[in-house]
């Protein structure tokens, strides 16, 4: 049994009670010196001193450390050190394919593409129902935020779109898509074709009708991943959702290239492209087992079917 490509689960921490402390202590650690061991030669080492504040570079403290270590020091100014957050999990403007996005009550999924109604000028963002519409629970007009709430996105300041339409997920019978669109906020900048190191989106590709084809995607969790098609027209695929086990027909199966998985939780909604950077599918589910590399399999819906059902075209 397969599960939807889960949006990241939110872990809740209990409130901490603390006794009165100096404000300085409550504000956290101060940037001074980081100390470690650096190599001097093949068999010799010295003290590594990393200065984290500009005004401390020529201070008496550095001179004192130098003296205490008898000159066996490697002093370098490194400045402020910040957490490393991938661009696709950060707040990004203009909006791009592959960014973290979600309904304000969902954790985080992926912005798949920019689309437009055939008779309208408004631009819509495309992703999964379970990313933008909270598995049928959302209402038209609900806020969509970038980044998703799990990545610190907040309703209001990070709202970028309003839910426009979703294809209902059915508990009985067959599902053929997990898809939704949200209307982009007016005057919000976006780049509908940027695929980072892959180049530029080159429209919509031909329907996948054979195995072995090379594909790629940019997703909220794993970023750029390469893969290959291992099956198509997959029927009776049972996918686990919060609302139950749902059946999907006529889907595409993909495995990761080399030793990596093609997708992980949070990559839901990713646009999958072929080796000519043409859109071919919309990612929606995956599992941890299977594949020739043992890293799991990913499932996606042919993009033509998604666009047809939602009555939209890709923005190029």
Summary of predicted features, one role per range:
Residues 1-115, 123:
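Noncatalytic regulatory segments and standalone regulatory/sensor domains
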Residues 41, 53-57, 119, 131, ...:
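Residues that cap or initiate secondary-structure elements
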Residues 57-70, 193-206, 296-299:
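Surface-exposed flexible segments
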Residues 65-67, 141-143, 200, 233, ...:
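Generic alpha-helical propensity signal that fires on short helical segments
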Residues 91-257, 273-275, 284:
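Serine endopeptidase catalytic core focused on the charge-relay Asp
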Residues 253-254, 261-262, 273-316:
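C-terminal subregion of chymotrypsin/trypsin-like serine protease catalytic domains
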Residues 264-268:
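Short, small/polar residue-rich loop motifs at catalytic or cofactor-binding pockets
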